[in-house]
């Protein structure tokens, strides 16, 4: 399934978040069920991400952890499940 994510980073600069997100130990947490992905900067402290997710249960579990951590840092996540459009 394809998802779009919008992440407001609070006071964290995009570059700091990107460095944290791409660390090998953090990427390993998503291995096997997440990706490919496309990441873009949205303003000075925002992220737009498109990702293919093959295990929605793991996504739910992962996002519980992420949202708990992010709330302590003033960050906010919005997730959108993308559906095909036959127009």
Predicted features along the sequence, with ranges:
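Short S/T/G/P-rich N-terminal loop/turn motif that feeds into the first structured element of a domain
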Residues: 1-71, 78-87
């Amino acid at each position: 399934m394809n998802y779009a994510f919008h992440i407001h980073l609070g006071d964290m600069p995009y570059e700091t978040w990107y460095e944290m997100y791409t660390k090998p130990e953090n990427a390993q947490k998503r291995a096997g069920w997440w990706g490919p992905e496309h990441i873009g900067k949205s303003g000075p402290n925002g992220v737009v991400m498109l990702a293919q997710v093959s295990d929605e249960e793991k996504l739910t579990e992962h996002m519980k952890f992420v949202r708990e951590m992010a709330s302590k840092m003033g960050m906010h996540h919005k997730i959108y499940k993308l559906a095909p459009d036959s127009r």
